[in-house]
Amino acid sequence: FPDYEVTEKIFNDYENSFIKVRFGRGPHAILILAYEDDGVYEWIGADSVKIYTLNGRIVKTAGLNSNIEILRPSDNIFLTGDVYEALNLYNPDLFSSNIRRSMNAPEASSIKKLGQKIQVNRIQENFDLALIGWSGVNLYYQNTTTGLIEYSEQRIHPRLPVIKIEYYFKY
């Protein structure tokens, strides 16, 4: 499926903050910000899919073929060094398994969004769920001015392709 760019006009057509989500090479979807609770954002799609993010990181999903839930996600996703978190995977089910993750030091980079070049920190997260031999790399692009995540590529479940998310905030 071809990708499409969110233009200033498309951005202005939405009343609320939203994310543009793409699973692997599939079509994109727009999810609207429905709620914010203690820093966790709940994004809802037209098909009732829900993605919950904390500082741009997916911490829970609902309505997908395979879902995840990080039981007590770390507030500061950018801590360097190893962090262990309890994780539930659904379809197939795996409960309270420990996932190890570590962040690399940020690298200066830039991305293009709404027709503008944005300076970002590119942050690489390595993860490993040893019990099932699943590991990988997630990427976060953090705006150097606002501190917000502008874009991410996340692997959240061994049965799902990489999820690419563009974040569009309205205040």
Can you say where each PLM-predicted feature lies in the sequence?
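Acidic, serine/threonine-rich low-complexity disordered tracts
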Residues: 1-53, 60, 78-171
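Acidic/charged, solvent-exposed loop-and-adjacent secondary-structure segments enriched in E/D, K/R, S/T
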Residues: 63, 67-72, 115
